[in-house]
UniProtKB/Swiss-Prot annotation:
Keyword Kinase in annotation: no
Family per similarity comment: Belongs to the HSP33 family.
Biological process annotations from GO: protein refolding
GO MF entries: protein folding chaperone; unfolded protein binding
Keywords on record: Chaperone, Cytoplasm, Disulfide bond, Redox-active center, Zinc
Name used for this protein in its record: 33 kDa chaperonin
Record Gene3D superfamilies: helix hairpin bin (1.10.287.480), Hsp33 domain (3.55.30.10), HSP33 redox switch-like (3.90.1280.10)
Domain of life: Bacteria
Any single GO CC term annotated in Swiss-Prot or TrEMBL for this entry: cytoplasm
UniProt-listed InterPro entries: Heat_shock_Hsp33, Heat_shock_Hsp33_C, Heat_shock_Hsp33_N, Hsp33_helix_hairpin_bin_dom_sf
Gene name as annotated: hslO
Function summary: Redox regulated molecular chaperone. Protects both thermally unfolding and oxidatively damaged proteins from irreversible aggregation. Plays an important role in the bacterial defense system toward oxidative stress.
Pfam family, one: HSP33
């Protein structure tokens, strides 16, 4: 199974983990964009992270991981539905492209910005957590987010190349199995030290069972059923209609005239094009467009 997450726990500890490996869905996401090769792994890290987090944060709806700033890469977004539908984009905006984006830290790429984690549930209230870009990597920033918001020790290892993305996540839980503070600290440090040895080659080539045995055999690891993921974009014509409607009738028809009788609405996630002509706007603003 090449596009899946695998939850696991360590026996007789209060530590849980999650493993993600994505290939087909990641390649589909990248293929819909004209990204510099040196930026593709960064998008892969965001896609892998949102897949891992989707198993940690229980929700019905959409989980969005986004960073926005004023640097060479002003916007990165990855989102995941509770059904395992993944999307992701990087936007360079008006910035002059760099010859090479590799080797730069996340704050150097984003500039003055903030990382947000948003849950849009199908029912209930929207939730958003914000964290400053105080770590060099996405994994560092997310660890800080969990330390501040959830007050749970959390560590991520994220990897990506042109064909695969994935990662490993460990999280300490409130005391249930083990109450001794020194023992809890020792178990956490051991798990992190073992996870630090993981390599991209292992992550992308070994079955989950084999990888977890290789990394954590001495801790006793229990693996749960895999959860599958795929690329799927939720865009549709109705969203384009809503965007045009939000302009108001006067501004919408002015835009129609500027664009020679056809308003184009493009989805940045999948490249789908939606065109709206005068008769479409007439129906929209008469209340009969569906």
């Amino acid at each position: 199974m090449t596009d899946a997450t695998h939850r696991f726990v360590f026996e007789n500890t209060d530590i849980r983990g999650n493993l993600a490996t994505l290939s087909g869905s990641y390649r589909a996401i990248v293929s819909n964009q004209s990204l510099p090769v040196s930026l593709q792994p960064l998008l892969g890290e965001f896609v892998a992270a949102v897949a891992l987090l989707s198993e940690t944060l229980k929700y019905d709806g959409i989980l969005t991981l986004q960073v926005r700033g004023n640097g060479p890469v002003p916007l990165i977004v990855a989102d995941c539905t509770n059904d395992g539908d993944l999307r992701g984009i990087i936007e360079l905006g008006e910035h002059q492209p760099l010859p090479d984006y590799s080797g730069l830290t996340l704050p150097e790429l984003i500039g003055d910005g903030v990382l947000s984690l948003t849950v849009d549930p199908e029912h209930g209230q929207r939730y958003q957590g914000l964290v400053p870009l105080e770590g060099d990597t996405l994994a560092d920033c997310l660890a800080l987010y969990f330390a501040q918001s959830e007050q749970l020790p959390t560590k991520l290892w994220l990897f990506a190349d042109q064909n695969h993305c994935g990662g490993l996540m460990l999280q300490g839980l409130p005391a249930q199995q083990v109450t001794d503070l020194d023992q809890r600290k020792e178990q956490w440090q051991t798990a992190v030290q073992l996870a630090n040895t993981v390599t991209p080659d292992e992550l992308f080539s070994l079955p989950a069972n084999d990888l977890l045995y290789r990394l954590f055999n001495e801790l006793g690891c229990r693996l749960f059923a895999a959860r599958e993921f795929r690329f799927h974009c939720s865009c549709n014509r109705a969203r384009g209609e809503n965007a045009i409607s939000s302009l108001g009738k006067e501004e919408a028809f002015a835009l129609l005239a500027e664009q020679n009788g056809k308003i184009a609405v493009d989805c940045h996630f999948c490249g789908q094009h939606y065109a709206f002509k005068e008769e479409d706007l007439q129906r929209l603003f008469s209340g009969s467009m569906h």
